[in-house]
Swiss-Prot record:
The gene is apt. Pathway: Purine metabolism; AMP biosynthesis via salvage pathway; AMP from adenine: step 1/1. Homodimer. It is found in: Cytoplasm. This is Adenine phosphoribosyltransferase. It is an enzyme of class 2 (transferase). It comes from Brucella canis (strain ATCC 23365 / NCTC 10854 / RM-666).
């Protein structure tokens, strides 16, 4: 059942060649999210290892991590914490800078969103180079969170993002891998 399940999820993800630039195979997870059965199965599969455990918060990375994280938080009876691009949150925030392919950006969360020692699952739709997820994890750790896991629907293993999170000592859970492109 496991391998058939992964094929089903993989088939629900649209691949758009040469987007946003030539040579890139863009993995469009919105087609999976738009398919009720596939979205439900993805959420259930990401929730399963943590059901019955104490999870205080689910932190979702802007923007598709909000969609996925909200559903996971609901299933785990946990709170939801948005991790956003700089300047999008209205109250006192904590911020971290991280490197992009062509520069630096910042993400932030509300200063009071996490209490020290809270058990958190970090969520986004996809992990590629891992820069954004690594910055989000460091921000949560800086706030005193205990990160139980980092979860993604899609892994692009050739880009090495998973290894960055594992180097921080974080368990990483993904459902579908697209290798070699």
């Amino acid at each position: 059942m496991e391998s058939g399940f992964k094929v089903t999820l993989k088939d629900a993800i649209r691949t758009i060649p040469d987007y946003p630039k030539p040579g890139v195979q863009f993995r469009d997870v919105t087609t999976l999210m738009g398919n009720a059965q596939a979205f439900r199965r993805a959420v259930d599969e990401l929730v399963y290892p943590y059901a019955g455990n104490r999870i205080d918060k689910v932190a979702g990375i802007e923007a598709r991590g909000f969609i996925l994280g909200g559903a996971i938080a609901h299933q785990l009876s946990a709170g939801f914490v948005p991790i956003r691009k700089k300047g999008k949150l209205p109250r006192d925030t904590v911020r971290i800078a991280y490197s992009l392919e062509y520069g630096v950006d910042e993400m932030e969360m509300h200063r009071d969103a996490i209490e020290k020692g809270e058990r958190v699952v970090l969520v986004d739709d996809l992990i590629a180079t891992g820069g954004t997820a690594e910055a989000a994890a460091k921000l949560l750790l800086q706030m005193g969170a205990e990160i139980v896991a980092a979860c993604f629907i899609i892994d692009l293993p050739d880009l090495g993002g998973r290894k960055k999170l594992e180097a921080l000592g974080l368990p990483v859970r993904t459902l579908v891998a697209f290798e070699g492109d």
